[in-house]
């Protein structure tokens, strides 16, 4: 095996009250990550696609490069590699752009060098790259990027991830607004009132109950009622409260995707066209009608 091509999905984290815990994989958008063995030792990174020119190719500064370097060191891989990433997920979108690249590289290296790592191990490696983007390792995006479906990152030391396969249609809008992951974290409160904590724990628990009972109405209702993170981050996304009000009768639920500015909604199917039109009317932005999808998968092997 000389080369692998991996499809690495976009993801949506938090889903309202599940801050830093909940995440889902999306069928689109996605990155394509190709890893090829080369004679020259070291790691070469090239990029194309969404804002590729703004992403560093230096191994130490690139999220996927950090993952590759650590795996090569840990498994004493002697071959050089060329990583080529086609960015289909816009960086800074709130759709797990850096996570997709990290997950795609971890998944691809595991296949290319037959490392036989578990999905949980792949999440551990992929989360190391997130420290470059967010300042500390986070798994709420890389976990669904690896596992697919709906994931809960319930612990970090040791890392624990729970996986629930689900089939849910979603609409994701990507307003042309700049929101960095770091600034979106800095705006959050350092302390949370007990009342807000109780609200979020209750709503998050209710969302899991709703999943197991195929109750989209309840799932979306609770997804829309985060009392801690969304009220802060809504300030960073012009028009968010307006869009939430306009969509309230057309969707089961709507919330900010990850750090934003992406907005994710669970549509009532008869209103999909209306929802897309409202997003375009308010933001004039790309809108994806997609569904909860698979984790990383091999698209091609040579």
Curated annotation (Swiss-Prot):
Q: What terms describe the molecular function in GO for this protein?
A: ATP binding; homoserine kinase activity
Write the protein's name: Homoserine kinase
Native organism: Methanococcus vannielii (strain ATCC 35089 / DSM 1224 / JCM 13029 / OCM 148 / SB)
- Which family, according to the similarity comment? Belongs to the GHMP kinase family. Homoserine kinase subfamily.
NCBIfam families linked: PRK01212.1-4, thrB
Using the UniProt record, name the top-level EC class of this enzyme in a single word. transferase
Described purpose of this protein according to its UniProt entry: Catalyzes the ATP-dependent phosphorylation of L-homoserine to L-homoserine phosphate.
Would the keyword Electron transport turn up in this protein's UniProt record?
no
Q: Where would you find this protein in the cell?
A: Cytoplasm
* Alphabetical list of Pfam families matching this protein: GHMP_kinases_C, GHMP_kinases_N
Biological or metabolic pathway of the protein: Amino-acid biosynthesis; L-threonine biosynthesis; L-threonine from L-aspartate: step 4/5
Q: Which residues bind ATP?
A: 90-100
> Which pairs are disulfide-linked?
none
The protein's Enzyme Commission number = 2.7.1.39
Q: Which reactions is this enzyme annotated as catalysing?
A: L-homoserine + ATP = O-phospho-L-homoserine + ADP + H(+)
Q: Does this UniProt record's set of keywords contain Nucleotide-binding?
A: yes
